[in-house]
Amino acid sequence: MDIAIQHPWFKRTLGPFYPSRLFDQFFGEGLFEYDLLPFLSSTISPYYRQSLFRTVLDSGISEVRSDRDKFVIFLDVKHFSPEDLTVKVQEDFVEIHGKHNERQDDHGYISREFHRRYRLPSNVDQSALSCSLSADGMLTFSGPKIPSGVDAGHSERAIPVSREEKPSSAPSS
């Protein structure tokens, strides 16, 4: 059977009716009503599944911003408390690890774990890195950039995660 490969703009216009990646990042979120509708299931290939109707900030997908003055990572970790998170810097990388043991939720028992690793720009001041967790579960890791020619000082160290009482000011796009 021949399947035509469509241009990405065409794929986006069809939205949820076009098959998406093999895996997404929505583990343990439970089923929604549209997951059970047979007309939404993919008949093109058993290896594809429909993308879920969720916003980017609800998806657990991170956003990395690096502008002239600072480097920032936004990561949705709404299922984790600051005690469940470990953030450390090793050389030119920041590693974010989250793990919580099995606990009961609305759909049964669930345990979650993730590990993310990001390369830091060479001009980030590693002595001024900070990490905070907002009330709505958005982890913000940030650090100022230093002028070129100044040594950024690379070493391994843990970055404490502080809790904020206000929701995140992360962009919704």
Swiss-Prot record:
Cellular component terms (Gene Ontology): cytoplasm; cytosol; nucleoplasm; nucleus; protein-containing complex
Modification type Phosphoserine: residues: 45, 122
Domain sHSP intervals: 52-162
Keywords: Acetylation, Chaperone, Cytoplasm, Eye lens protein, Glycation, Glycoprotein, Metal-binding, Methylation, Nucleus, Phosphoprotein, Zinc
Cell compartment(s), UniProt: Cytoplasm; Nucleus
Modified residue annotations for N6-acetyllysine: 70, 99
Binding site for Zn(2+) 1: 100, 102
Post-translational modification comment from the UniProt entry: Acetylation at Lys-70 may increase chaperone activity.
Binding site for Zn(2+) 3: 154
UniProt region (Disordered), positions on chain: 144-173
Annotated segments matching region Required for complex formation with BFSP1 and BFSP2: 1-63
Bias (Basic and acidic residues): 153-167
Entry keyword annotation includes Nucleus: yes
Family: Belongs to the small heat shock protein (HSP20) family.
Protein known as: Alpha-crystallin A chain
Source organism: Bos taurus (Bovine)
Primary gene name: CRYAA
